[in-house]
C-alpha cells in the first residue's frame, strides 16, 4: 500500500478515508479499556499534562489511539509514529490523523520510511521541540542519544552492522547534513521518557550503567500490571491469533517450540498448549527452565528442537536465537515466527539469499537449496502485530494506564528534583490502583481487611499489600 499525505496536513497515513472505520473501532475499544478511561476521567479537569509535548513511538493500533486521545485529554500536545514497520492499523492511524494529531505511520513501511517517521515526531510545526518521549523498544530514545554523539564523532555511524543500522545511520547522516545540532538540541529539551517494553528497558539500564542516559526514565514494563498482564495474558491471546490468520494451520498435535520462558514465553506456551500442541521450551535461565519443566513442558535446546518442531516462536529479547543452521535443519513447511520486540531473534539476514515467495503480506515461503520450504511470518518481526492486530483492548488498558500515570509523574515532577537522571519504576500503590480500576469491568468483588487483620500482617488497610520485592 502506498502511503498518502496531504501536504496541507501534518500527517502521513495510508488512507485518510479509513478514519470513519477507525473511529468506530476506537469507540468499541474505549468500552474495553476501563483503567485507561478511568484515568482520563479522573485527571481531565486538572490537565496534568498541560505544556507537555510528547513524541510518541509505539505501535499505531486502535488501542494506542485511545492512549493518544487520553494524553491529549489531559493537556498534552502529541506527535506519533509506530515503533514497528508492520504493526500499524491503517484505520487507527487515519482516525487519529483526522482528529488533528500528527501521525506518521502505515502498515508495511520501509526501514527508510520508519526512521524518517521517527525523526518527524520530534519536528513540531512551530519550530519547537518535544519535552517528553513515550517509547516502545527505545528507538526514539536511541535516535536522540546516538545522533547527539554522532554530532561530535561521525565514526559512530560509519560502519553499520545490520540492515537496521544501515538505514538508521543513513538517516542520521542526512539529518546532520541539514542541521548539525538537531539531535543535541532535541536531546537537551527532553525532560523524561516512559518505556513500554522489556527490550527498551534493557536499553535504558545499559545506557544508565554506562553514564550515557541524559534524562530520567520510568520503566513502565516492570509495573506488575503491565508485565504480568500485557506480556503474559496479552501474548496468550494474540500469538495464536497471528499464527492462525497467517497460516490457517491446525495447531493441535503439532510440536511447538517456544524460545524463552519469561512472561511472554509463558503466555505463548499456555496458548499453544491450550490448542493441544506439544510444547517444548528452550531456556538459558535455570529458574525459568525449572518453571517450564514444573508446568509439564519439555525443556530442550534449539539445536535439538530444530529438526523436530512444526512451529517455532521466539520470545527472548536476544540475538540469533534461531540461526541459519537451525532453519536449514527444520522440517519442510515449518512455521517460524517471533513475538519479541526486534527482528534479530531469528537470523533473517542469513536466509535473504534464498528464494522468497510472498504468499500474502507478511507471510513468506523461503526455499532452501535442497528444495525444502519454511514459512516465515512478518519477516521475523512481531507476529501478533504483523499478522494480526496485537493484544486485546482490555489488557492494553492496564499497560496504557501505567504509561499515562508515568507521563504525569515525570511531567509534574520535572523541576522538583525527585527524578535525577536514572531509571525508575512506579510505586506499588499505583500498580494496585490500576488493578482496582481494571477489576470494575469484570464485576470482581475484593475482600477488605479489617483494621485488626491489617495490623496483624503489618500493612495499611487500603494498601499497598505487598513489599516491593514481592514476586507475583
UniProtKB/Swiss-Prot annotation:
Cofactor binding remark: Binds 1 NAD(+) per subunit.
Q: What is its EC number?
A: 3.13.2.1
Q: Which terms does the UniProt entry file under GO BP? A: L-homocysteine biosynthetic process; one-carbon metabolic process; S-adenosylmethionine cycle
Record keywords: Lipid metabolism included?
no
Q: Where does NAD(+) bind?
A: 197-199, 231, 260-265, 283, 318, 339-341, 384
Q: Give UniProt keywords alphabetically.
A: Cytoplasm, Hydrolase, NAD, One-carbon metabolism
Pathway it belongs to?
Amino-acid biosynthesis; L-homocysteine biosynthesis; L-homocysteine from S-adenosyl-L-homocysteine: step 1/1
Q: EC top class, in one word?
A: hydrolase
Localization = Cytoplasm
Q: What reaction gets catalysed by this protein? A: S-adenosyl-L-homocysteine + H2O = L-homocysteine + adenosine
Keyword Cytoplasm tagged = yes
The family database entries (Gene3D superfamilies) matched by this protein are listed as: Adenosylhomocysteinase-like, NAD(P)-binding Rossmann-like Domain
What GO CC terms are in its UniProt record? cytosol
Positions annotated to bind substrate: 61, 136, 196, 226, 230
Q: Mind telling me which HAMAP family this protein's record contains?
A: AdoHcyase
Please explain the role this protein plays, according to its UniProt record: May play a key role in the regulation of the intracellular concentration of adenosylhomocysteine.
Protein family (similarity comment): Belongs to the adenosylhomocysteinase family.
Identification of the protein by name: Adenosylhomocysteinase
Q: Which organism is it from?
A: Cupriavidus pinatubonensis (strain JMP 134 / LMG 1197)
Amino acid at each position: 500500500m502506498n502511503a498518502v499525505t496531504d501536504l496541507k496536513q501534518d500527517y502521513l497515513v495510508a488512507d485518510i478515508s479509513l478514519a470513519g472505520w477507525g473511529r468506530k473501532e476506537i469507540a468499541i475499544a474505549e468500552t474495553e479499556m476501563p483503567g485507561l478511561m478511568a484515568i482520563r476521567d479522573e485527571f481531565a479537569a486538572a490537565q496534568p499534562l498541560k505544556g507537555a509535548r510528547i513524541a510518541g513511538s509505539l505501535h499505531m493500533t486502535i488501542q494506542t489511539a485511545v492512549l493518544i486521545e487520553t494524553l491529549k485529554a489531559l493537556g498534552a500536545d502529541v506527535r506519533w509514529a509506530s515503533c514497528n514497520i508492520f504493526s500499524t492499523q491503517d484505520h487507527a492511524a487515519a482516525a487519529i490523523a483526522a482528529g488533528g494529531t500528527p501521525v506518521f505511520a502505515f502498515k508495511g513501511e520501509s526501514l527508510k520510511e520508519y526512521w524518517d517517521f521517527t525523526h518527524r515526531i520530534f519536528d513540531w510545526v512551530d519550530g519547537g521541540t518535544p519535552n517528553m518521549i513515550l517509547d516502545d523498544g527505545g528507538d526514539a530514545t536511541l535516535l536522540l542519544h546516538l545522533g547527539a554523539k554522532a554530532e561530535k564523532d561521525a565514526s559512530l555511524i560509519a560502519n553499520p552492522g545490520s540492515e537496521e543500522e544501515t538505514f538508521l545511520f543513513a538517516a542520521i547522516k542526512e539529518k546532520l547534513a541539514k542541521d548539525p545540532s538537531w539531535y543535541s538540541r532535541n536531546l537537551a529539551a527532553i525532560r523524561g521518557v516512559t518505556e513500554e517494553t522489556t527490550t527498551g528497558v534493557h536499553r535504558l539500564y545499559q545506557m544508565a550503567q554506562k553514564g550515557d542516559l541524559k534524562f530520567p526514565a520510568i520503566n513502565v514494563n516492570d509495573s506488575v500490571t503491565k508485565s504480568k498482564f500485557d506480556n503474559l495474558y496479552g501474548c496468550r491471546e494474540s500469538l495464536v491469533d497471528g499464527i492462525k490468520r497467517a497460516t490457517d494451520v491446525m495447531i493441535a498435535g503439532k510440536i511447538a517450540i517456544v524460545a524463552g520462558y519469561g512472561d511472554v514465553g509463558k503466555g505463548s506456551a499456555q496458548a499453544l498448549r491450550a490448542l493441544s500442541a506439544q510444547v517444548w521450551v528452550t531456556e538459558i535461565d535455570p529458574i525459568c527452565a525449572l518453571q517450564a519443566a514444573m508446568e509439564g513442558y519439555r525443556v530442550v535446546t534449539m539445536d535439538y528442537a530444530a529438526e523436530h518442531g512444526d512451529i517455532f516462536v521466539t520470545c527472548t529479547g536476544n540475538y540469533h536465537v534461531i540461526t541459519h543452521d537451525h532453519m536449514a535443519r527444520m522440517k519442510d513447511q515449518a512455521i517460524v515466527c517471533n513475538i519479541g520486540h526486534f527482528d534479530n531473534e531469528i537470523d533473517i539476514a542469513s536466509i535473504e539469499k534464498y528464494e522468497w515467495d510472498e504468499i500474502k503480506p507478511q507471510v513468506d515461503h523461503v526455499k532452501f537449496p535442497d528444495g525444502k520450504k519454511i514459512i516465515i511470518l512478518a519477516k521475523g518481526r512481531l507476529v501478533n502485530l504483523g499478522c494480526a492486530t496485537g493484544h486485546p483492548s482490555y489488557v492494553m488498558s492496564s499497560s496504557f494506564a501505567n504509561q499515562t500515570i508515568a507521563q504525569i509523574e515525570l511531567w509534574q515532577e520535572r523541576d522538583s528534583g525527585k527524578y535525577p537522571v536514572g531509571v525508575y519504576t512506579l510505586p506499588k500503590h499505583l500498580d494496585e490502583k490500576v488493578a482496582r480500576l481494571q477489576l470494575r469491568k469484570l464485576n470482581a468483588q475484593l475482600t477488605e481487611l479489617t483494621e485488626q487483620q491489617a495490623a496483624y500482617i503489618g500493612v495499611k488497610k487500603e494498601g499497598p499489600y505487598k513489599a516491593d520485592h514481592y514476586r507475583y
